[in-house]
A protein has these predicted regions:
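AMP-forming adenylation/ATP pyrophosphatase catalytic core
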Residues: 1-189
Length: 189
């Protein structure tokens, strides 16, 4: 459900970019990209907007990468409670060497929910409650990637945005020394 390609490889209209677009269409399950599909890709690159294709794939630009995401596949993975969510892999650990935004010590007996961003999701950071969408914007996570990036909540409270930010509640809990360590990583293949 995730494909990325550097924008520079397909921005120029030449034989190489056509080859990459052809490879891309096969990977997306589109027999061949039609003119309208190529225009959608061009619009996404030039206007930095999200565009949708007919087969559940969407694309957008983030950090000079053209990113294609199949939200249906991601949603199925979220619903199956799988440990792999798109390009994110979650695992439990007994100990860690370094504590950073890719690890979190979460309360063991709580119902931990990992899901994509929902409208109105907020996180408490440095005593202030701010929208998670604002956190994404500040870290350059936009378009299609923002729609599938995991958000970890306990009840209605957002505790952790993996790789980006921990809430004040999570930071306080981690200071207690209790451990139910979950680590997140990005694994591209």
């Amino acid at each position: 459900g995730y494909i990325e390609i550097p924008v520079t490889l397909i921005k120029e209209k030449n034989i190489k970019s056509n080859m990459y677009l052809s490879l891309l269409s096969k990977t997306l399950g589109i027999p061949s990209l039609q003119k309208k599909d190529i225009q959608k890709v061009t619009t996404s690159i030039n206007d930095e907007k999200k565009v949708d294709f007919d087969n559940n794939w969407s694309c957008g630009v983030s950090n000079a990468l053209l990113i294609f995401i199949n939200k249906k596949i991601w949603q199925e993975q979220y619903e199956s409670k799988d440990q792999d969510l798109g390009l994110f892999k979650f695992s439990s650990l007994e100990k860690i060497k370094a504590n950073n935004n890719w690890t979190a010590s979460l309360p063991k007996k709580e119902n931990i929910n990992i899901a994509p961003l929902k409208n109105g999701d907020k996180i408490k950071v440095n005593g202030n409650t701010i929208k998670v969408s604002e956190i994404f914007r500040n870290y350059g996570i936009k378009n299609v990637l923002k729609e599938v990036w995991p958000v970890v909540s306990i009840g209605d409270e957002v505790y952790w945005v993996p790789g980006i930010r921990k809430s004040d509640s999570l930071i306080d809990y981690e200071k207690s020394g209790k451990s139910n360590i979950i680590t997140a990583s990005i694994e591209k293949s």
